[in-house]
UniProtKB/Swiss-Prot annotation:
Active site residues per record: E49, D60
InterPro entries in alphabetical order: Aldolase_TIM, RibuloseP-bd_barrel, Trp_synthase_alpha_AS, Trp_synthase_suA
EC number: 4.2.1.20
Stated name of the protein: Tryptophan synthase alpha chain
GO cellular component terms, A-Z: cytosol
Keyword check for Cell wall biogenesis/degradation: no
Pathway: Amino-acid biosynthesis; L-tryptophan biosynthesis; L-tryptophan from chorismate: step 5/5
Catalytic reaction annotation: (1S,2R)-1-C-(indol-3-yl)glycerol 3-phosphate + L-serine = D-glyceraldehyde 3-phosphate + L-tryptophan + H2O
Complex and partners: Tetramer of two alpha and two beta chains.
Source species, domain of life: Bacteria
Organism in which the protein naturally occurs: Microcystis aeruginosa (strain NIES-843 / IAM M-2473)
Lineage, opening ranks: Bacteria, Bacillati, Cyanobacteriota, Cyanophyceae, Oscillatoriophycideae
One Pfam family from the record: Trp_syntA
């Protein structure tokens, strides 16, 4: 059984909801990212989503876009990101999910890319600009290498598309809570509860909710609606961006612990 699926199976058996923090690799620098992985792991992260900096991040809001730009300006490349993941093996227990756009995969070639991330110790993959109609070209070879490709359900997805995504998504289903890009919002759309029910009607696969969750009270609300995981990105990235590396890591740890406590 692959690491992401095993993590959710273990959590479900205990009646627990997963916490999945997201950070952008290389912001503010690679050393801080390496420390952040370890800090998030010990602060209660069940899985960790690590964003590969990309120049045209269509799904990302201003906080994560800015983080990616800073990392790219520092010269951060995929190989640097994978080196961080590789060095974390044995220390970081939480499975690491790589968040990357399709272009870097295409340019390397699917098999080469998958071999690279597998060797580094990546367990899962989120590709936000990969349409369902083209997902099979990545899903099958990834599964053969033990890497789970997590597909996204949008608030605008019709029932038949939700069913198709639920059927093919591996590890869990990533429910996008809002139409638009990532970012912090004052409240989580109540339609999320309805969308969770729609997904539940067609699959028993775990569902993680992301985009717009920035406070412990919101995380608890999403958990109470029936989510198997809460995904928090921009609010994590902002804590690293707004402080010195040492203060940012301290703030990151405190925030992660507060989220974990809220959903336990």
């Amino acid at each position: 059984m692959t690491a992401v699926t095993e993590c959710f199976r273990s959590l479900r058996s205990q009646g627990n909801c997963a916490l999945i923090p997201f950070i952008t690799a290389g912001d503010p620098d690679l050393s801080t990212t390496a420390q952040a992985l370890r800090i998030l792991d010990r602060a209660g992260a069940d899985l960790i989503e690590l964003g590969v900096p990309y120049s045209d991040p269509l799904a990302d809001g201003p906080v994560i876009q800015s983080a990616a730009t800073r990392a790219l300006n520092r010269g951060v490349k995929l190989e640097d990101v994978l080196e961080i993941v590789k060095n974390a093996q044995g220390e970081v227990k939480a499975p690491i999910i790589l968040f990357t756009y399709y272009n870097p995969i295409y340019h390397r070639g699917i098999d080469v890319f998958l071999d690279q991330i597998k060797a580094a110790g990546v367990s899962g993959l989120v590709v936000p600009d990969l349409p369902l109609e083209e997902a099979e070209s990545l899903l099958q070879p990834a599964a053969a290498k033990g890497i789970e490709v997590i597909l996204l359900v949008a608030p605008t997805s019709p029932p038949e598309r939700i069913q198709a995504i639920a059927l093919q998504s591996q590890g869990f289903i990533y429910l996008v809570s809002v139409t638009g890009v990532t970012g912090m919002r004052k409240q989580v759309a109540t339609r999320v509860e309805e969308l969770l029910d729609s997904i539940r009607s067609v699959t028993d696969k775990p569902v993680g909710v992301g985009f717009g969750i920035s406070e412990p009270t919101q995380a608890l609300q999403v958990k109470n609606w029936g989510a198997d995981a809460v995904i928090v990105g921009s609010a994590m990235v902002k804590r690293l961006a707004d402080n010195s590396p040492s203060d940012g890591l301290k703030s990151l740890e405190e925030f992660c612990r507060s989220l974990k406590q809220a959903i336990q």
